[in-house]
Regions:
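Short amphipathic alpha-helices and their capping/turn segments at secondary-structure boundaries
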Residues: 34-40, 73-83, 158-162
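Hydrophobic faces of well-ordered beta-strands that scaffold small-molecule active sites
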Residues: 46-48, 87-89, 168-170
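Short, solvent-exposed turn/loop segments enriched in Gly/Ser/Thr/Pro and often Arg
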Residues: 90-97, 172-180
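Catalytic domains of carbohydrate-active enzymes, especially glycoside hydrolases
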Residues: 74-93, 124-125
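The feature marks proteins involved in alpha-glucan
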Residues: 1-47, 57-61
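Aromatic- and acidic-residue-enriched carbohydrate-binding clefts of CAZyme catalytic domains
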Residues: 61-63, 68, 99-159, 163, ...
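Conserved, mostly hydrophobic/aromatic
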Residues: 50, 79, 89, 137, ...
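Short, well-ordered coil/turn segments that N-cap beta-strands
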Residues: 44, 83-85, 164-166
Length: 180
């Protein structure tokens, strides 16, 4: 049995203390309405790789729910119009995008030391915008949801893709040595 989410919706980019998470196990009562995987031929597919937050976060996207699964749903007609048949989503599972501890040095201090150690900044952790790290693979990222139920919103997005005969592919990152 795997959790499909966690109680409480975190604010994207806000540091969270490493505390026990309360898992949510939603029922399987989602109405897929006879939804079927489009099964498109790869040689006839036009793929578009996107980041949920990055695709619709800017005001120029003109969506109501910026940076969310619902925001992508608002842009599906546009994607279909330009000929996209398949969207590959960069990690959409729950992951911590911020470190537990935040370094308090000024940006001038950071810039001054950036040239040392080949550009690496020992002791600094940056925002994990992309999500390529270990995570909770069965739980859609709550910060990518416009509403409280990220699992429901993600399922609705997949269903909207399929209504347009569009496929959705998910990327996952599994750290070296992880037993998968």
């Amino acid at each position: 049995l795997h959790a499909r989410g966690f109680l409480s919706k975190p604010v994207y980019g806000k540091t969270r203390k490493n505390v026990n998470r309360i898992a949510v196990f939603p029922g399987e009562d989602f109405d897929w309405e006879q939804d079927e995987h489009p099964m498109l031929s790869y040689c006839e597919s036009v793929c578009y790789c996107m980041h949920v937050r990055g695709f619709t976060m800017h005001a120029s996207s003109k969506v109501t729910h910026r940076g969310t699964f619902a925001g992508i749903a608002e842009k599906l007609d546009y994607l279909q119009e330009i000929g996209i048949t398949t969207v590959e989503l960069q990690p959409v599972y729950e992951f911590d995008e911020t470190p537990e501890e935040v370094n308090t040095k000024t940006s001038a201090d950071i810039v001054a030391t950036a040239g040392e150690n080949g550009g690496e900044l020992p002791g600094y952790r940056v925002l994990n915008y992309w999500g390529y790290r270990e995570g909770f693979y069965y739980a859609p990222k709550a910060a990518y949801a416009a509403e409280e139920d990220a699992a429901l919103e993600f399922r609705q997005l997949v269903k909207e893709f399929h209504k347009r005969r569009m496929e959705v592919i998910l990327q996952f990152y599994f750290p070296k040595g992880m037993d998968v």
